[in-house]
Regions:
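N-terminal leader/auxiliary helical segments
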Residues: 1-188
């Protein structure tokens, strides 16, 4: 649900102070300050888990696999100043305008979807009738639409994962599994 909106700054509880950064990740304390009393609801806990994984992904994982450079060749984290991206695993420099495209970053997501669903046995037939326990930042009424979109994302074959251009698959899997273990051992 947090990704099914154009208002990701709101749905991901991002701190507006960091709006100019390339990596803007969820501020979990903003979420728990508002919804701590609802965390016993499985959909709210799932929302929190999503934010936790996003935070770890953007704060810890992405900086290990790519570097962002300005036009003078200096590393920068200011989005407006980035001109070049270095993809470490593939030892490739690309123009920043190509990075967030289907050819690279977003394309890797597409190529991984079917593989990840099968690897982690992610159920696809979920009940869309989820009652909103009091969350204001996402639309619980959009669940069926999200599930329909999920099926569209699975149109690529499982072996498409062998053609990633940004993400080192084994490192990504190890990181996601580690983040999940850490979350489960201490969710709050």
């Amino acid at each position: 649900l947090p990704d099914a909106t154009d208002q990701k700054e709101i749905s991901h509880f991002r701190n507006p102070v960091y709006r100019d950064k390339m990596m803007v990740f969820p501020d979990l304390t903003r979420f728990t300050a508002k919804y701590n009393s609802l965390l016993s609801d499985s959909s709210v806990l799932g929302y929190y888990f999503h934010l936790y994984i996003d935070r770890r992904f953007f704060k810890d994982f992405i900086p290990e696999i790519v570097d962002f450079y300005d036009e003078t060749g200096q590393i920068t984290d200011i989005k407006e100043k980035i001109s070049t991206v270095y993809i470490r695993n593939f030892q490739t420099y690309i123009p920043f305008e190509k990075y967030l495209t289907e050819e690279y970053y977003y394309g890797d997501y597409t190529k991984m979807n079917t593989y990840l669903v099968k690897r982690y046995l992610i159920p696809l037939n979920l009940n869309p009738q989820i009652i909103n326990p009091g969350i204001n930042e996402v639309q619980y009424g959009n669940v069926q639409q999200i599930l329909d979109s999920l099926h569209e994302y699975l149109s690529v074959t499982e072996d498409a994962v062998n053609d990633l251009k940004v993400f080192p698959l084994n490192k990504l899997l190890a990181s996601l599994e580690q983040y999940t273990i850490e979350f489960l051992s201490n969710p709050l």
